[in-house]
Amino acid sequence: MTSTSSHSNHSALSSYGWDDSWADAFAPYAAEGLLPGRVVRVDRGQCDVVTADGVLRADTAFVTPHDPLRVVCTGDWVAVEPGGNPRYVRTYLPRRTAFVRSTSSKRSEGQILAANVDHAVVAVSLAVELDLARIERFLALAWESGAQPLVVLTKADLVPDPVTLAYLVQDVETAAPGVPVLPVSAEQGEGLDVLAAVVSGGTAVLLGQSGAGKSTLANALLGEAAMDVQAIRDVDGKGRHTTTTRNLLALPGGGVLIDTPGLRGVGLFDAGNGVDQVFAEIAELAEECRFHDCAHESEPGCAVLAAIDSGALPERRLESYRKLMRENQRIVAKTDARARAEIRKEYKRRGAIGKAAMEAKRGGLR
C-alpha cells in the first residue's frame, strides 16, 4: 500500500478510532494489499466493515474459530480483501480491550460483546427501583474488560425532586467506588453535554438491561433517530429493548458509540480482577485482617467484619462481593475443566490417527 493510500486510510478512519499504532499493527497486511476497516455490525457469518471506501459487506468464514472469544465482533479492526464477491475478512488486529460475559451462570462459555472499547457506559433506569447488585455485576465486567466504566442514570426527569435524586446518586456511588455517576434525561437534554464530553475521542459501549433507555440515549448522543425505539408503557415507565444487534456509530462530537441489545443475563467470565476493583474498599480492609487468608466469615481480628459492625461498610456490599466471587470461581473452574476435556479429546483424536497409521503400515508389511 502506498504512503498516499495509507494517509487516506488514516484520514477517513480517524473518526472511527484509527491511529498511528493501529496503522503500525496493520502494516504487514497493508503490504499484502488488504484494506483496514472497523467492524460496525456482525450478523450471521457476515459483517459490515467501515473502510476508507465506505461501508463494505464481508464474509467472516476465514475468521470463525471454535473459540467463541476469538470470533470477529463489533469494534474489531480487521483486514479485508479489496475485492471479490463475496469479499472476506482475513484477520483482525490484536484487541486492546474486550468486553466479555458468560453466556450462562451455569455454563463456562464466554461471549464477547465488544472490542477495543475505552469507556463502558452502564445505563440504569430511574423508572424502576435501583438494583445495586446488578450495577456491581456490570461494573465488574467493565473493569475486567480494561475499559473505564461510567454509570448513567437515565430518565432522571422521572425524579423531579433534587434531594431524592441526590440520594439515588449517592446510593449508586456506594456501589461504584471510583466510577463517575451521571444522572441524565434524554427527553429534556439534561446531562447529555457532560456525557458527550466524557465519551468523545474514544470508543464507548452502551450497556444495560432491557428498557434502561439505551436506544433513546444513543439517539440523543447521535442527534438522530438511528436506533429503533419502542413506546414506553405509561403505566410504569418501563421500556422494551429494541436494539437486536451490536452497532458501532460515529458520534458527531467525536468518538464512537457501540449500542448493545438489552442484557437479561450478565454472567461473569473470569472477572476476578474486575470484582476486586468494584469492591476495592473490601480489599483495602482485608489488608488489615489478622490472618492473610481471612475469609471474613467469623475469624478473630477480621477488619472487614469490624467495618460492618461499626457501620463503615454496608453488609450488603460484603454479601454481594461473596456472591460474585463464588460465581466467578465456579465459571473459572468449569472453564479450566472444559479446556482439559478439549485437550484430552485432541490427544485421543491424534492417538486414533497414529494407531490407524501404524495398522496401515503393518498391513503393508505383510
Swiss-Prot record:
Cofactors (names): Zn(2+)
A molecular function GO annotation: GTPase activity
Transmembrane segments: none
Residues engaged in binding GTP: T154, K155, A156, D157, G208, Q209, S210, G211, A212, G213, K214, S215, T216
Keyword vocabulary terms for this entry: Cytoplasm, GTP-binding, Hydrolase, Metal-binding, Nucleotide-binding, Ribosome biogenesis, RNA-binding, rRNA-binding, Zinc
Binding-site residues, Zn(2+): C289, C294, H296, C302
Main localization category: cytoplasm
Cofactor comment text: Binds 1 zinc ion per subunit.
E.C. number(s) listed in UniProt: 3.6.1.-
InterPro entries: G_CP_dom (IPR030378), P-loop_NTPase (IPR027417), Ribosome_biogen_GTPase_RsgA (IPR004881), RsgA_GTPase_dom (IPR010914)
Domain (CP-type G): residue spans on this chain: 107-266
Entry-linked PROSITE patterns: ENGC_GTPASE, G_CP
A biological process from GO: ribosomal small subunit biogenesis
Subcellular location: Cytoplasm
GO terms for cellular component: cytoplasm
KW Transcription regulation (keyword) present: no
Similarity comment: Belongs to the TRAFAC class YlqF/YawG GTPase family. RsgA subfamily.
UniProt function note: One of several proteins that assist in the late maturation steps of the functional core of the 30S ribosomal subunit. Helps release RbfA from mature subunits. May play a role in the assembly of ribosomal proteins into the subunit. Circularly permuted GTPase that catalyzes slow GTP hydrolysis, GTPase activity is stimulated by the 30S ribosomal subunit.
Subunit annotation: Monomer. Associates with 30S ribosomal subunit, binds 16S rRNA.
Name this protein carries in UniProt: Small ribosomal subunit biogenesis GTPase RsgA
Annotated organism of origin: Streptomyces coelicolor (strain ATCC BAA-471 / A3(2) / M145)
